[in-house]
Amino acid sequence: MIKEKITNEFIEDICRQFGIEGDFKYYEVLTNGHINTSYKVFFYRDGEMKDYCLQRINSYVFKNPVEVMENISNVTEYIRSVIKSSGITAKRLVLHFQAAQDGKYYYIGPNGGFWRCSRFIDESETFNQTDNLAIIEEAGKAFGDFQLKLVDFPVKNLYITIPHFHNTIMRYEAFYEAVKNDSCGRASGVKEEIERYKSLEGVATEMYKMQRRGELPLKVTHNDTKCNNVLFDKSTGEYLCVIDLDTVMPGLVGFDFGDAIRFIANSAKEDEKDLSKVKLDLNKFEAFAKGFTGKLKSVLSENEKDTLALGALTMTLECGLRFLTDYLNGDVYFKTCYEEHNLDRARCQLALAEDMISKRNEMKAIVAKYAG
């Protein structure tokens, strides 16, 4: 990834490339997310403070960031048109990216860094984790509404910016390769985790195989449906829009649902060391399922409804497998805070997946209750 010396002057100069006017005041580093580097930048203009989100895209992860931005701009403009067609102002209900001086929605910096800039949405907030079931239900509505607004978007027009992103068969192949190569000499210390992930390969690859057989349709999916990727209105608590659209691609509805559940309905944090705390919270599961399927049930096939619970298990296993694979490869993909951070994440996801297996019947019953 491109390394650049970050100073006030550097941040201001990048922002100016996006036509931002006013007096530069300061910036803050945003720490959410594992992939991109993000800053909240403040300018004073027209008697008030204006804030922007400036991001440098991780070109190690996103090999073609131009295609990432084309996907994002196409999807956000489509959503904007859907909202406007209903007579509602779209200002706070969809992200707005700043065009650079050449009219493109990105700028390549002096050292090759790939930058973009969007407006912060006024009077909004996010939640990394919450026990508030009303907020969780709103998050479900937000992601369901995102897919509903894009139900007629031509999926074939989207670039696949990360090939095989949820190809769990290939994820297992990469895992086996990491175990075989053992490039950092870490495999001997995680033999138990390796064997447990191996034993769950069948269930983890079931949905991908269904899609290949034509039993599940590809749709526009977000592919990073964490609660902190939803903006909420500070006053009402209602959802405004979803953010962090880098991974918008063709995908399965159940994968978006499942990735949200593995994050929102985990009773512990993603890197919890005490695995006895790691459980699937069925109350949170139900709150999200109610919001998500309430928005989408009219456009879901029976197979899609039937595999939502399986999607939660699949995404939890896939995520944990990716953490373990990255740990074996030397932590080259996800940002880490300490040497065994990815290993702790992998263990946590495994514990959550095993608890999901024990509660699978309850999960399916809850989905059926709201999906109709």
Regions from the PLM with identified roles:
Residues 10-14, 29:
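Extracellular/periplasmic, surface-exposed regions of secreted and cell-surface proteins
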Residues 254-298, 314-333:
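Active-site activation/catalytic loop segments of kinase-like enzymes and analogous catalytic loops
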Residues 305-315:
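Small/polar glycine-rich anion-binding or flexible loop at a beta-alpha turn
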Residues 13-23:
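A short, low-complexity linker immediately N-terminal to eukaryotic Hanks-type protein kinase catalytic domains
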Residues 26-44, 49-180, 253, 264, ...:
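Conserved ATP-binding subdomain of kinase catalytic cores across diverse folds
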